[in-house]
Design a protein with these regions (language model features):
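Conserved helicase motor core of SF1/SF2 NTP-dependent helicases
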Residues: 4-7, 17-46, 51-59, 78-80, ...
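Inter-Walker segment of RecA-like/P-loop motor cores
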Residues: 51-53, 58-59, 64-98
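Conserved RecA-like helicase motor-core motifs
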Residues: 70-75, 274-288
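Short beta-strand-loop-alpha-helix junction that forms the active-site gateway
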Residues: 152, 321-324, 622-634
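Metal-dependent nuclease catalytic regions and adjoining charged, substrate-binding loops involved
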Residues: 309, 564, 591-592, 599-604, ...
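Metal-dependent nuclease catalytic cores in nucleic-acid-processing enzymes
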Residues: 339-353, 631-660
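Metal-dependent nuclease catalytic cores that hydrolyze phosphodiester bonds in DNA/RNA
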Residues: 385-611
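Conserved catalytic cores of phosphodiester-cleaving nucleases, focusing on short active-site segments
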Residues: 612-627, 640
Length: 704
């Protein structure tokens, strides 16, 4: 273990003296080292660290074991709640229930002397109230260390508030949970991660102030301005150069505001690299967490949110231009201030940082908040500028005019349930609990692998492929036709003649008949690759033997014993993968427009697309291959049912079946309840959160 720096030792000394400490720490400043050194220097204190990030928890736990530290335990909010309150607390919904019911601990809480609240800039009211409950249930006063970086608060739209860090002393003032009422403010300004050149870029170009200090020299920050097509080629070429020089794929991040979108630059770069047998990983959804096994040994394409708390040697930031505000941060009122997401993205690299600015249209321009222009970059010693510099830029008048026209929002159940604000979840959770009942409890669990190892030694997540292949095999045995093959064929129709030749070749070589689960898993992978326009799983999964014949027999028997009951008689109705609404069909949205109009601006319209897993004469089924039925699954079914009612369709039962566990959840509802939930979800996504004033915040968030 390295000796603590002066900044870090000051934090530890204040803790030794019995004070509470609030510490603002820049990216890469050694918060984890400070935590470990505190544990080492205070062996007589029992310490609990609560952190936001499960991957960080795992990393620190490994270091605790390595250094033989026995007086510290590491938890996330969820793991702590699971340990002492309920197995259901692995989700926010479970924690919310514990607070609502004031659930008593299921075992005695071990006494602690010092509680370290890490990454507290991303604390929300839910987590804050859980910490208070936990400490009260423990029953003895403690000392606290509150750590974080207000500029790394990324989840404000979900209810996170950096004031839990910046106003911590006022929040906790007078609390009987504390041994001492004395608070000391410290800071960790020295970043041991980024280079001097990156530090200068952050300080001088992004913030115009001495935000952070650095202590190692490196190469200049590479700033590239070019067309989208040329940037794609440049990134691929540069990554190949790095790999040829000995850099490993696992040492490269490619970050963007979003990795979604069929024509996104991120996907084109990934496909170009995978075509050259370079291992890559792209999350299926922008909100997916990065699994350590799955990303191991690969170039990772990710959002800024998913990369938080991580670092790699080389980082490419795609879309480092004003399109960020136009496309991904429309609700930010002040474009003259650096968003936290871009600060996080620019502080993930340890060796090389590449910033990519698009120069495709006359209105493309640099980020408004930058304190330096292209010509300033050329003159500086910490930036290598590539491209044609400009100093005069056109205003996007067409975009300004468009603001007064009809603003259509294209939604699907999957998109609607991502990044739901805590305030919305607090409102809808009691309603959802009333709507759903367990009509069939968990029975024998079928062991279906969710992550598999390939011949190349990589790991791939296959839960999405299982969820497509197993129901498809069941449908085909009912209908005696290959539904999945038809879905693949229909998806290919949308592709242009000269694109995705690799996928077209794969489809051409596929057998029309599927005889085993292996065939269905391969076909599911092909279908997913076509839908997402991503090649990596198709290229990197080399065997499809992770589900045995016995397992698939068990799955089919379970499906037949549950769904087959509704398919008795002659010519039973069974419509798998059934489209109930499409965003392009205006007449389907007439009633929806009427119902939503009172809740949203006059020029805002919503257009929905939704596909249900299985429609029978009696029910609409959502089929899952997962560990448990979650809040997200229930919300999807709520949205399906609401759309179904808006279309004035005949009444049906809405059910969720977990194929792995056999659990069935049924929804009983009134249409007004569904509308309340859908409106709340849409408002949470498209309306700005009204932040409380500091006085209101302190009034409501007090530890007293």
């Amino acid at each position: 273990m390295n000796q603590p720096s002066e900044e870090q030792q000051l934090v530890i000394d204040n803790l030794k003296n019995g004070y509470n400490v609030v510490c603002s720490a820049v990216a890469g400043s050694g918060k984890s080292s400070t935590v470990l050194s505190t544990s080492k220097q205070m062996p007589d204190r029992q310490i609990l660290q609560i952190t936001y990030n499960s991957s960080l928890r795992l990393e620190i736990k490994e270091k605790v074991k390595y250094f033989g530290l026995e007086n510290i335990s590491i938890h996330t909010f969820h793991s702590l709640a699971v340990k002492y309150y309920s197995p259901d607390c692995h989700t926010d919904t479970g924690i919310r229930r514990v607070l609502l019911n004031d659930t008593k601990p299921r075992s005695e809480i071990l006494k602690i002397d010092l509680c370290m609240l890490d990454e507290f800039q991303d604390c929300s009211e839910l987590y804050f109230r859980f910490v208070l409950k936990f400490l009260r249930d423990m029953g003895s006063p403690i000392q606290i260390l509150i750590l974080g970086d207000p500029l790394q608060c990324l989840y404000g739209f979900k209810g996170a508030d950096s004031r839990f860090l910046t106003m911590a002393d006022q929040i906790w003032k007078g609390s009987d949970l504390l041994k001492s009422q004395t608070f000391v403010h410290c800071s960790l300004k020295m970043s041991y991660r980024i280079t001097d050149q990156m530090g200068k870029f952050v300080n001088e170009a992004m913030f115009g102030s001495q935000l952070m200090l650095t202590c190692k020299s490196g190469e200049p920050v590479t700033y590239i301005r070019n067309s989208r097509h040329n940037i794609e080629k440049t990134v691929v070429y540069t990554i190949k150069e790095l790999l040829d020089s000995g850099v490993k794929p696992s040492e490269i991040f490619v970050l963007a505001a979003s990795v979604k979108g069929l024509n996104s630059n991120v996907r084109k770069m990934e496909n170009a690299l995978v075509d050259q047998n370079i291992p890559c990983h792209v999350p299926m959804f922008d909100t997916d967490k990065l699994d350590e096994r799955v990303i191991g040994g690969k170039i990772v394409f990710s959002t800024f949110h998913c990369a938080k708390g991580r670092q790699r040697k080389y980082v490419f930031v795609i879309g480092f231009d004003n399109n960020y505000f136009n496309q991904f941060a429309r609700t930010l009122d002040d474009t003259s201030q650096c968003p936290n997401t871009l600060y996080v993205g620019c502080t993930r690299a340890t060796h090389g940082l590449y910033l990519l600015e698009f120069d495709q249209y006359p209105t493309d321009r640099p980020l408004d908040f930058l304190k330096m222009g292209h010509h300033d970059f050329i003159k500086s010693d910490f930036v290598k500028f590539k491209g044609i510099p400009r100093s005069i830029f056109y205003q996007d008048e067409a975009g300004d005019k468009a603001k007064s026209l009809i603003d259509k929002k294209y939604e699907s159940p999957t998109k609607m349930i991502k990044f739901i604000p805590d305030s919305v979840l607090d409102y809808i959770s009691p309603i959802i609990d009333r709507l759903f009942t367990i009509s069939s409890p968990i029975s024998n669990t079928i062991d279906i692998p969710m992550i598999v190892e390939t011949k190349g030694g990589f790991f791939e997540s296959v839960s999405d492929l299982n969820g497509i292949a197993i129901p498809s095999l069941y449908y085909d045995r009912l209908n005696r036709e290959n539904l999945l093959y038809k879905m693949v064929e229909n998806s290919m129709i949308e592709m242009k003649e000269n694109e995705h030749m690799y996928l077209k070749r794969i489809v051409k070589e596929m057998p029309v008949q599927c005889e085993s689960i292996k065939d269905y898993l391969l076909l599911a992978n092909v279908y997913t690759a076509i839908q997402e326009r991503l090649y990596f799983k198709l290229k990197q999964i080399d065997e499809y033997d992770w589900i045995s014949e016995q397992v698939i027999t068990d799955c089919l028997e379970r499906l037949d014993s549950i769904i087959g009951i509704e398919l008795k008689g002659e010519n039973p109705q069974v419509l798998p993968e059934h489209v109930i609404i499409h965003h392009s069909i205006e007449e389907q949205h007439a009633k929806i427009d009427q119902v939503l109009a009172p809740h949203f601006p006059d020029n805002m319209r919503f257009r929905f697309s939704a596909v249900v897993d299985l429609l029978t004469e009696a029910s609409i089924w959502e089929l899952k291959c997962t560990g448990d039925i979650s809040m997200d699954h229930k919300l999807q079914v709520i949205i399906y049912a609401w759309i179904w009612d808006m279309l004035d369709k005949p009444a049906k039962n809405f059910k969720i079946l977990n194929i792995i566990t056999g659990e069935i959840v049924t929804m009983n509802y009134e249409p007004e309840e569904l509308t309340r939930i859908v409106v709340a979800l849409l408002k949470g996504k498209y309306e700005n959160i009204n932040l409380k004033t500091d006085d209101e915040f302190l009034r409501d968030m007090t530890a007293v």
